Amino acid sequence: MDEHIDEICSDIEYQVKNGIATMPLFSMTLVPEGDPAIDKAELLTKSYEKFKARLDALGIPSGALIQASIGHGGKLNADSAFQKYIGFNDGTQRAVCCPLDEGFRQYIRKSAERIAKAAPAHIMLDDDFRLMARPQRGCACPLHMAKFNELCGTDLTREELYEAICKDDALGKKYREAFIKVEIDSLVGCAKEIRAGIDSVDPTIPGSFCLCGKSAEGAFEIASIMAGAKNPVTVRVNNSNYCAPSPRFFAHVMHRAASQIAALRGKPDYILAETDTCPHNRYSTSAAMLHAHFTFSILEGAAGAKHWLTRTASYEPASGKAYRKKLQKNLGFYEELSRITPRLTWLGCKIPIPKEPVYVLTPEDNLKVGDGWYAHVLDRFGLPMHFSPSGEGAVFLDSAQDKCFTDEELLEFLSGKVVLDGAAAEGFIERGFGKYLGVDVRRRDPSEPNASGELIYPSGSCLAQPDVRELTPLSESTEKYTDVYHLRDGVYRDVMFPGVTSYKNELGGTVVVFAGSSSFEYGWRTAFGMLNETRKKNLIKILTDLGTLPIYYPEDGEILMKAAKTEDGGLLCAILNMGLDVLDELPLIIKRDVKSIRRLCPDGSYEPLKFEKEDELYTVKSPLGVFDPLILIID
């Protein structure tokens, strides 16, 4: 890109002066190639120094992004002599260097030293610096296996270790903890070499780290090393939204941010979101998606972002104009939202975040990472939901999520208000908590009469839930919201068993059980036993009975909503229209007397909005655009 240095530096100057960006980082792909390894740092830093000189003259600080250190795994032009990553679960070799290899450590240390000699204002280590957050679930090369066997006093092969961990018995758990420790320690040791290279030139240069994976895989330790002595610790979380084919499932980026921020336990000084538009044009990511992504990342706890707004594969400046315009317009919006978010108390449907990070090493571990309620149902219905280890509201669990929590934590859930889908209820029963659910759960045989539909009380019917199980009440106190029926002869509805039940247990809690699964493929045969207005009314009644529904959108638009108490007793409501229909006005059911409704504006100010009231229905006289986040303050 050197031939476009004038245009690029002018663009950077515009971004910094207009609050679009604070500091540009120049990408350096250092994953070694060749034997001996090519000195990529020398080649790339020479180019960076040309840009840095121009930016220094403009008074603009700049830094370096070590975009690849051990490698993201893509095909290389030439192999290096360093030990390669060997997949833990499949034994395959990847185009990734093992961070235990002493030769590689010296290579990356010298590379960091060369970058530091250019006097960057910041050095960020990118998220290829990971081992378990890959499809192969860790490095089991000879170096890593030797470290593991030394730690445990064993002589296991990769295959034997993987088999033991998959069993998940006492020995398997011991080996799991040791394996995780060895993987993280190898990264931490390598990060120390990178920092040593920087410190050998200038120990005051600040650094940061980009983590990858919900488990946060040693992120705070690595970020603390990269920061350098007496510098703030900064971590970029891994909540990218590359090439999203649809606004649907946007909740995944929220959940990833929330999970990683929880795993970091408040330790870093700064947390940045990954609002990367990769591959950096609007055929991949719209400016609206970028704005929504940044907005909801702030609501999950990010204090800024590592943006990537510029095409780097080729010089295509027009591809970033809409991104810059959107971010510049909303600078005040982001700053005000960042100011008020830390003092919010979240309300509504609570997706609990485990207190201990969940490392996905085996196929069984994948089942723990449920996304049913938050990414298939609640995110479409305009019912407030939040991801949190704390906060208020009814706890929603699906799949095998119970395995992420201790017995004590499950009892705490059961002592409050909890909603389980059929798979989650099975997990609670297997753990010995069946008596608190009020029902037994049985998987049905395919030869049994099919579940044609569901009667929703007090009136209405719809398709049966996906993957429905049979619920059998265990107490006269078990109440039912629905019944599953078999349609006989195309006319007769033969009721078979309850579809949704509620039970007040001896712990003082109320447990709602759905017979089906909240996780399903999005298709007309699978999704619409859940995604319909009758089911939405069913959920509204349940949440109203539980007393956990302070506000909601009552109609059939695809609305994602978050709600929270403000520190002065007001109500914040964050709304995202995920459908393709602009709403001319916004109806809301609000369970409180409302004096005013204000909108957070792009410049950070608040605009009063007009509304009409009819009982609990408040109709806000303001349009809601497609994928345009709306932040309301309701007093």
What are the functions of these language-model segments?
Residues M1-E3, T29-T45, D90-R109, L171-G189, ...:
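The substrate-binding groove and active-site-proximal loops of carbohydrate-active enzymes
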Residues I5-P32, R114-H122, V233-T234, A292-G304, ...:
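Catalytic domains of carbohydrate-active enzymes, especially glycoside hydrolases
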Residues E7-S47, I70-T92, M132-P135, C139:
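Aromatic-lined carbohydrate-binding/catalytic grooves of carbohydrate-active enzymes
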Residues N18-G19, F51-S62, R114-A121, G189-G207, ...:
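A structural motif corresponding to the C-terminal end of an alpha-helix
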Residues F26-T29, M132-P135, G197-W373, P449-V468, ...:
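Hydrophobic targeting/anchoring helices
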Residues P61-A119, D127, L131-P135, F148, ...:
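Active-site-adjacent "subsite" loops/lids of carbohydrate-active enzymes
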Residues I108, I115, I123, I198, ...:
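Conserved, mostly hydrophobic/aromatic
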Residues V369-G370, A375-H376, R380, F387-S390, ...:
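A conserved amphipathic helix/loop scaffold
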